Curated annotation (Swiss-Prot):
<keyword id="KW-1133">Transmembrane helix</keyword>
<dbReference type="GO" id="GO:0016121">
    <property type="term" value="P:carotene catabolic process"/>
</dbReference>
<dbReference type="Pfam" id="PF15461">
    <property type="entry name" value="BCD"/>
</dbReference>
<feature type="transmembrane region" description="Helical">
    <location>
        <begin position="229"/>
        <end position="249"/>
    </location>
</feature>
<dbReference type="GO" id="GO:0005506">
    <property type="term" value="F:iron ion binding"/>
</dbReference>
<dbReference type="GO" id="GO:0005886">
    <property type="term" value="C:plasma membrane"/>
</dbReference>
<keyword id="KW-0408">Iron</keyword>
<feature type="transmembrane region" description="Helical">
    <location>
        <begin position="108"/>
        <end position="128"/>
    </location>
</feature>
<feature type="transmembrane region" description="Helical">
    <location>
        <begin position="87"/>
        <end position="107"/>
    </location>
</feature>
<keyword id="KW-1003">Cell membrane</keyword>
<protein>
    <recommendedName>
        <fullName>Probable beta-carotene 15,15'-dioxygenase Brp</fullName>
        <ecNumber>1.13.11.63</ecNumber>
    </recommendedName>
</protein>
<dbReference type="GO" id="GO:0042574">
    <property type="term" value="P:retinal metabolic process"/>
</dbReference>
<comment type="function">
    <text>Is required for retinal production and bacteriorhodopsin biogenesis. Probably catalyzes the cleavage of beta-carotene at its central double bond (15,15') to yield two molecules of all-trans-retinal.</text>
</comment>
<feature type="transmembrane region" description="Helical">
    <location>
        <begin position="48"/>
        <end position="68"/>
    </location>
</feature>
<feature type="transmembrane region" description="Helical">
    <location>
        <begin position="320"/>
        <end position="340"/>
    </location>
</feature>
<keyword id="KW-0560">Oxidoreductase</keyword>
<keyword id="KW-0472">Membrane</keyword>
């Protein structure tokens, strides 16, 4: 639990390393939430097709490169044996999660939601460690609570405020594999919302209450509380398709860039290790540039190759939706499949460094 609160920026004008992407993440979500709040008052509505286009722009063009960057940055300066095990574990995770969708799509969707919560939550807590400290989170259960609340905003809040759209897209996602399984989403949705909203609300109150009581006056609690409430407001006010599509590039990725800028990972370098990515650190600029290009190409081919395999194996790749809506559903499934090992292997099992490394 790193404590850098003494270097903490103010809420809007940080001074620590990584201050620019941190500020961008906050102002972006604040501006979007405010814009949609004003828009609703003026009777403005965004067509679903436009929302889908924004989602694809955010998740494919803006956010996908950062996911690859996280892995390559984590694997740089690591031994070849570790890199090999990492890649194998990653591919096994992808295969297992992909198989779950074909066998039990509803369970797969449930796990996908859990992965999104975990990625946003635990990745967020790690960025807090590096950027403004977490001295108000004094125990491991309290850190988990913070992660669930922050990550829960990504999925739970849209379920509460954008219920119809959330369930409609969930139905399309399930229909990619088995349209008959959609019936499992039926039932008393109003009661589910009540239970889900009550439970999440209690967790938010507990998180903020404990943080307030254990705050040490360094500013970390105030920053955490403000960001938590901002996330909740953002996902409540911004249409869910746009909200999710822009959250990952504008918030998650931006804050991980800020974390990377704020920490020094040179101490974790295995000086005597020889790995598959050593050429990236070559003294010869031409060789380093060529290696970077090769990594980009290999990563792109591998990613879209996996997407192509999923597309070809899926009984109904667009889930019965239109082109844009179907692509949003398909890409959401694909991203969740590759995100599972991203979180489990890259974030949790790699205890030496990991994609969210903070010394």
């Amino acid at each position: 639990m790193s404590n850098r609160s003494q270097f903490v920026p103010s809420w809007l004008v940080p001074e620590a390393a990584g201050d620019l992407p941190l500020t961008v993440s906050r102002l972006s979500l604040l501006a979007l939430a405010a814009a949609f709040a004003v828009g609703y008052g003026a009777g403005f509505a965004v067509p679903l097709e436009v929302q889908a286009g924004v989602y694809l722009l955010g998740m494919v063009a803006m956010n996908l490169p950062h996911g690859g960057y996280e892995h390559f940055e984590n694997l740089r300066r690591r031994a070849a044996s570790f890199q090999g095990k990492y890649i194998v574990a990653y591919l096994v995770g992808i295969a297992a999660f992909g198989a779950l969708f074909f066998v039990a799509p509803v369970a797969g969707l449930g796990l996908a939601v859990t992965v999104a919560v975990a990625k946003g939550g635990f990745g967020g807590v790690q960025s807090m460690d590096a950027l403004y400290g977490t001295d108000h989170l004094r125990t491991r259960p309290q850190r988990w609570l913070a992660a669930v609340v922050r990550g829960g905003a990504v999925m739970v809040v849209p379920m509460l405020f954008w219920t119809d759209v959330f369930y409609a897209f969930s139905s399309v996602m399930i229909s990619i594999f088995d349209p008959s399984a959609v019936s499992a989403l039926g039932g008393d949705i109003a009661t589910r919302r009540l239970v889900l909203g009550g439970g999440y609300g209690a967790l938010v109150v507990a998180h903020l209450g404990l943080g307030y009581r254990r705050a040490a006056g360094t500013g970390s609690f105030l920053a955490d509380a403000a960001e938590t409430l901002l996330l909740i407001a953002y996902f409540a006010l911004v249409p869910v398709v746009i909200a999710v599509g822009l959250y990952f590039p504008l918030w998650y990725s931006a804050r991980q860039v800020a974390r990377s800028s704020a920490v020094d990972d040179t101490a974790m370098t295995q000086a005597d290790a020889t790995g598959m990515l050593d050429a990236l650190d070559a003294d010869d600029p031409a060789r380093a540039t060529l290696a970077s290009w090769a990594v980009l190409i290999v990563g792109s081919v591998a990613t879209f190759g996996l997407a192509a395999v999923l597309w070809l194996l899926s009984p109904q790749p667009l889930g019965g939706g239109g082109i844009l809506v179907g692509l949003v559903a398909f890409w959401s499934i694909f991203v969740s499949i590759i995100a599972l090992p991203h979180v489990v292997v890259g974030g949790w099992l790699d205890r030496t460094r990991g994609i969210w490394y903070v010394p």
